[in-house]
From Swiss-Prot:
GO terms for biological process: positive regulation of myelination. Belongs to the protein kinase superfamily. CMGC Ser/Thr protein kinase family. CDC2/CDKX subfamily. The modification Phosphoserine is found at residues 12, 51, 66, 75, 109, 417, 420. ATP binds at residues 127-135, 150. This is Cyclin-dependent kinase 18. Residues 121-402 form the Protein kinase domain. One of its GO terms (molecular function) is protein serine kinase activity. It comes from Mus musculus.
């Protein structure tokens, strides 16, 4: 025991040396273990009666520490001090499981945290109401972040609407910076609630706010983001089928995200037959207007062209109120289709029945003068009668129109925002408010189309 006291005294009076903490601890541990071994071998120290507290301290002092143990301790934070009830809630006090969690166990763990429970979210304002659903602005009690709660009423005789099932099944697998994120799903006897990330504006509101006069640089940034999200969907054989400004959500940073996948479909083969009762009338391609039920990703590209025109001019391209009027507006601008511009069109019974006048095509530049030459070229490549001839989203991303955005926008990870690049910034809009972006207020619902 005297040897131990002398050793501790020498250690406390020693002069610090320029060595690392690990080296000092390693040397101390080695000397301590050697001294302990020598003491046991010499047998010179007389055993003395120790109190229980001193016995515990002695056992702790005699414990051998490896360098692995020391490194583990050095890598820990100084003092975490997490509340015990929080640790119990997350079950962090239990040792790690030797095997990966099963799907059922993982669901149970998420449920313990609060996912999948209606009481986890607080409803704030009603954003709008439709036939099957009501959308609320809400807040998560877990994260304190704002969310959008899409509450779908369940009819007992019908169950969940097919649009809701479709939206959930598709969105749960889509992880992209330009696609709205589905955070949670809550199923009760009376409702199905989809919890989305909250974006408090959309492209329609943005246009209204800037007096329908956007900066052309901002048009390019929004267009690139739209194509980026759509290319991600099309690469996974998913068609949106309902593109319009109200379904393109925008946050305060200017990030644009595809939303409202209620009409979207996973396309297994190009020839699969679908319903032609899809897509808002103004953004519906002529082949669908004439009754086509066999289509692929080009159905979305016509709508992209209409949205590009609307951003550049501040007004919708083909605002028809009926199918016949919609076709009439299209043919007056692009010319009445012929077998040369649209092979097979004369064999479509609906086309023959309408008996349209023979319109000649008009130059797009005279209708969208703010678009530059490359922009007009891109628009022309999207507004083609023959669906398979329309430019794809992937090809459109590489169009010279976007060259001014630089090369780095094409190298981003799917989940990375283009605004993570310092060279990508919105500019002032020349509209009556003259702001690059500002929230359009906290008033009425931003859209009805989410239902």
């Amino acid at each position: 025991m005297n040897k131990m006291k002398n050793f501790k005294r020498r250690l406390s009076l020693s002069v610090p040396r320029p060595e690392t903490i690990e080296e000092s601890l390693a040397e101390f541990t080695e000397q301590f273990n050697q001294l302990h071994t020598q003491t046991n071998e010499d047998g010179t120290d007389e055993p003395e009666q120790l109190s229980p507290g001193m016995q515990y301290q002695q056992r702790q002092n005699q414990r051998r520490f490896s360098m692995e143990d020391l490194n583990k301790r050095l890598s820990l934070p100084m003092d975490i001090r997490l509340p015990q009830e929080f640790l119990q809630k997350l079950q962090l006090e239990n040792p790690g499981l030797p095997k990966p969690l099963t799907r059922m166990s993982r669901r149970a763990s998420l449920s313990d945290i609060g996912f999948g429970k209606l009481e986890t979210y607080v409803k704030l304002d009603k954003l709008g109401e439709g036939t099957y659903a009501t959308v609320f602005k809400g807040r998560s009690k877990l994260t304190e972040n704002l969310v959008a709660l899409k509450e779908i009423r369940l009819e007992h005789e019908e169950g969940a609407p097919c649009t809701a099932i479709r939206e959930v099944s598709l969105l749960k697998d889509l992880k992209h910076a330009n696609i709205v994120t589905l955070h949670d799903l809550i199923h009760t006897d009376r409702s199905l609630t989809l919890v989305f990330e909250y974006l408090d504006s959309d492209l329609k509101q943005y246009l209204d706010h800037c007096g329908n006069l956007m900066n052309m640089h901002n048009v390019k940034i929004f267009m690139f983001q739209l194509l980026r999200g759509l290319a991600y969907c099309h690469h996974r054989k998913i068609l949106h089928r309902d593109l319009k400004p109200q379904n393109l959500l925008i946050n305060e940073r200017g990030e644009l995200k595809l939303a409202d996948f209620g009409l979207a479909r996973a396309k297994s083969v190009p020839t699969k037959t679908y319903s032609n009762e899809v897509v808002t009338l103004w953004y519906r391609p002529p082949d669908v207007l004439l009754g086509s039920t066999e289509y692929s990703t080009p159905i979305d590209m016509w709508g992209v062209g209409c949205i590009l025109y609307e951003m550049a001019t501040g007004k919708p391209l083909f605002p028809g109120s009926t199918v016949k009027e919609e076709l009439h507006l299209i043919f007056r601008l692009l010319g009445t289709p012929t077998e040369e511009s649209w092979p097979g069109v004369t064999s479509i019974s609906e086309f023959r029945a309408y008996n349209f006048p023979r319109y000649l095509p008009q130059p797009l530049l005279s209708h969208a003068p703010r678009l530059d030459t490359e922009g007009i070229n891109l628009l022309s490549s999207l507004l083609l009668y023959e669906s398979k001839s329309r430019m794809s989203a992937e090809a459109a991303l590489n169009h010279p129109y976007f060259q001014s955005l630089g090369d780095r926008v094409h190298q981003l990870h799917d989940t990375a925002s283009i605004f993570s690049l310092k060279e990508i910034q919105l500019q002032k809009d020349p509209g009556y408010r003259g702001l690059a972006f500002q929230h359009p207020g906290r008033g009425k619902s931003r859209r009805q189309s989410i239902f």
